Amino acid sequence: MVKSQLILGIESSCDETGVALVRAPADGSVPTLLAHALHSQIDMHQAYGGVVPELASRDHIRRVLPLTGTVLAEADCRLAEVDVVAYTRGPGLAGALLVGAGVACALGASLDRPVLGVHHLEGHLLSPFLSADPPEFPFVALLVSGGHTQLMRVDGVGRYELLGETIDDAAGEAFDKSAKLLGLGYPGGPALSRLAEQGDAAAFKLPRPLLHSGNLDFSFAGLKTAVLTQAKKLGDELPARKADLAASTQAAIVDVLVKKTLAALQASGLRRVVVAGGVGANRLLRAQLDAACARMGVRVHYPELHLCTDNGAMIAMAAAMRLQAGREAPNREYAFDVKPRWPLDALA
């Protein structure tokens, strides 16, 4: 009888170090998260106004093994019980990815266990399966983060069709760069969203790029320019109107994300949506998409709020689901294999 598999997942693609343990049942049912631990580098990078790759890599080195110990203790498991060691193969910062790959390969070799490199975006895409109400295939997925904004048709694990993507800045970049223009510090997206709650979203008429383009692509670079222009026009009035400009900026970004997602639903004929990635935690996005989808009779699934950011749980879950689906076999090559640039729709 084939036993369940215990999978250790390691995330180190950018500025969060995450480790998790997932149990994948032999019968193919949804894997179970046993424990996870996460360390954010936000405080370290704040002084620089953004992520410093070298510092990120060094901090991953310091954190990943202690986090592994924490997770094993929380799950009441021994390292020797791990069947597969999974890690984020890409996309991401090359040096940061190599830390996770190196630790995974070292653990795998020392335990004589296979390793499996996981696509970071597939981790986000499948993260709602960690919730109490997991989605069912097929569905439309909105992947929205600091570095990516994509609409995908998802028919199963490893069966992804790109419907549309940003042609310039990602939605998360639009939040962060607009926040920087308003002097809100790092990380900018959450700061802008908090300030927006105090403002009037109708105060400024900002563009909704590509909203009526007839396709499912996004563009946010022009919005950033419009925010800069408006901030300069306000001049000395900016401090008093900053909340209004933040609210108007957030409204423009969310409006485009929601309407493009609805268009993807109509084009595909699907009745389920998954929203994943850091921007998926945005309250306005959730409220507006929930309301619009409720009117259409469409179900919306999100990761738990604490799993919207990068984390090891999504990497362990993606590895478990790929193994269950027979999409990939783990290996004992221990090759430190990473792919800093790696389109999700190229994943078999």
UniProtKB/Swiss-Prot annotation:
Cofactor: Fe(2+)
GO-annotated cellular components: cytoplasm
Chief subcellular location: cytoplasm
Domain of life: Bacteria
Residues that coordinate or bind Fe cation: H120, H124, D310
InterPro entries to which the protein is assigned, alphabetical: ATPase_NBD (IPR043129), Gcp-like_dom (IPR000905), KAE1/TsaD (IPR017861), Peptidase_M22_CS (IPR017860), TsaD (IPR022450)
GO molecular function: iron ion binding; N(6)-L-threonylcarbamoyladenine synthase activity
Record key words, sorted: Acyltransferase, Cytoplasm, Iron, Metal-binding, Transferase, tRNA processing
Catalytic activity annotation: L-threonylcarbamoyladenylate + adenosine(37) in tRNA = N(6)-L-threonylcarbamoyladenosine(37) in tRNA + AMP + H(+)
Cofactor note: Binds 1 Fe(2+) ion per subunit.
Entry EC no(s): 2.3.1.234
Transmembrane segments: none
Record localization: Cytoplasm
Biological process annotations from GO: tRNA threonylcarbamoyladenosine modification
Protein residues bound to substrate: L143, V144, S145, G146, G147, D176, G189, N282
Functional summary from the UniProt entry: Required for the formation of a threonylcarbamoyl group on adenosine at position 37 (t(6)A37) in tRNAs that read codons beginning with adenine. Is involved in the transfer of the threonylcarbamoyl moiety of threonylcarbamoyl-AMP (TC-AMP) to the N6 group of A37, together with TsaE and TsaB. TsaD likely plays a direct catalytic role in this reaction.
Stored HAMAP family: TsaD (MF_01445)
Family the UniProt entry places it in: Belongs to the KAE1 / TsaD family.
Protein name, as recorded: tRNA N6-adenosine threonylcarbamoyltransferase
